[in-house]
Amino acid sequence: MFRIVNGEDYSPAVQQRNILDFGKAPSLLWTDNGSSNDRCETGGNCRESGQDRVKRPMNAFIVWSRDQRRKVALENPQMQNSEISKRLGYDWKMLTEAEKQPFFEEAQRLRAMHRDKYPGYKYRPRRKAKEATEIASRRLFSTVQPNAHRGDLVPLHIQGRLRQGHTFTNGKPVKPLAAHEHKQLTPATGASQQLDKPAPQ
């Protein structure tokens, strides 16, 4: 399962041989096996979800770019994968509709096979880690804010500024407080107390 990696594994000759062999031998990346348990889609260890995940069928660009990527990599062994991807995107845009047509037909055939093999399939993209973190922080914020009452003090870093001293909380405008209405949270109790009390009249 594991092997020791040495510097020779990254030599141009070995990389070129790997590129040539890519796609010839069955690999998890291109496998059509639905029981590959998610490894082909995430590159992870498949135990994250209790169910088998199914790869999406390839679209026309992916069908075309599979062979093209190999050719470009062989012609330009020093080119980075990101540069190859940019070049392939540009080359695909430059193809005429007639040149693209066989790849659209192949993609349609693959889609039909996929539909027959997985009739109940529905594409469910995974959330990226950053996106999931933002959603979690929004949920936390939304659970804290509804508990605030109109008279409670909202921390300044949460308030947004409108024009001429008006503020808003949760998208609703709030009138600025008069000098005698300012409140402060005391550190010990968290209770609010008046700072500037109006003089008794």
From Swiss-Prot:
Protein name: Sex-determining region Y protein
Subcellular location as annotated: Nucleus speckle; Cytoplasm; Nucleus
Gene Ontology terms: biological process: cell differentiation; male sex determination; sex differentiation
Family membership noted in the UniProt record: Belongs to the SRY family.
Gene this protein is translated from: SRY
UniProt cross-references to PROSITE patterns, sorted A to Z: HMG_BOX_2 (PS50118)
GO molecular function terms noted in the UniProt entry: calmodulin binding; DNA-binding transcription activator activity, RNA polymerase II-specific; RNA polymerase II cis-regulatory region sequence-specific DNA binding
Ranges for region Disordered: 166-201
GO cellular component: cytoplasm; nuclear speck; nucleus
The keyword Protein biosynthesis is assigned to this record: no
Naturally occurring in which organism (per UniProt): Delphinapterus leucas (Beluga whale)
Quaternary structure annotation from Swiss-Prot or TrEMBL: Interacts with CALM, EP300, HDAC3, KPNB1, ZNF208 isoform KRAB-O, PARP1, SLC9A3R2 and WT1. The interaction with EP300 modulates its DNA-binding activity. The interaction with KPNB1 is sensitive to dissociation by Ran in the GTP-bound form. Interaction with PARP1 impaired its DNA-binding activity.
Posttranslational modification: Acetylation of Lys-130 contributes to its nuclear localization and enhances its interaction with KPNB1. Deacetylated by HDAC3.
CDD domains noted in UniProt: HMG-box_SoxA_SRY (cd22034)
Bias type Polar residues, positions: 186-195
Lineage: Eukaryota, Metazoa, Chordata, Craniata, Vertebrata
Origin superkingdom: Eukaryota
Keywords: Acetylation, Activator, Calmodulin-binding, Cytoplasm, Differentiation, DNA-binding, Nucleus, Repressor, Sexual differentiation, Transcription, Transcription regulation
Pfam families linked: HMG_box
Principal subcellular localisation of the protein: nucleus
